Each structure stands twice: as structure tokens, then as C-alpha cells.
């Protein structure tokens, strides 16, 4: 697991400031890919381990894209391709509500 960087700190601040955890009933959000590694990127890859229906998932993605001005790719852990999930878990950084 990697450590929080500026991109993740910005995401965490946005999630907390906009009550995203409460609004979408999330306990934590995992960040993986280039954002987790601190590399420049125009998207953020997010792993959701909570039960989220597809309508809520689309609303979450749309709201985060609007707030962060970045493309958001969301993977739901229970439906994820095992190879993608394995790679994500190697570098995941979790953001939680405090």
C-alpha cells in the first residue's frame, strides 16, 4: 500500500467537504493507479468495496467528476475482474471519513 499524496489529499478533502461518504453510504474509498502512485494523470481510479447500486454509482462518478474536474473511473470490488482487483490491491491508498 502506498501513502497519501497531493492528489489523494485533494480527493479526501473533496469527499469530506461535500459529505460524499454520507450521501452515498460509503465507509472508505480506495484509490489506485497513477493517482495512488503520485503520477500526473487526468483521471482517478477508485475502488469501492461497499454495496452501491448502479444508479448511485453513476451519480457518485458524475459528482466527483464535476467537483474535481477529472475523469473518474470506478471499480466495484465485488464485480471487478480478478486481475484488475489484484493489481489495484498492490497499490491502493484508502481514503476514509474521519
Label every model-predicted segment:
Residues 1-30, 36-41, 49-98:
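Catalytic core of pol beta-like nucleotidyltransferases
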Amino acid at each position: 500500500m502506498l501513502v497519501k499524496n497531493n492528489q489523494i489529499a485533494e480527493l479526501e478533502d473533496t469527499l469530506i467537504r461535500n459529505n460524499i461518504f454520507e450521501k452515498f453510504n460509503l465507509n472508505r474509498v480506495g484509490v489506485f493507479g497513477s493517482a495512488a502512485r503520485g503520477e500526473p494523470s487526468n483521471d482517478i481510479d477508485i475502488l469501492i468495496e461497499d454495496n452501491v447500486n448502479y444508479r448511485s454509482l453513476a451519480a457518485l462518478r458524475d459528482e466527483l467528476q464535476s467537483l474535481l474536474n477529472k475523469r473518474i473511473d470506478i471499480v466495484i470490488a465485488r464485480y471487478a475482474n480478478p486481475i484488475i482487483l489484484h493489481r489495484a490491491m498492490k497499490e491502493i491508498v484508502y481514503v476514509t471519513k474521519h
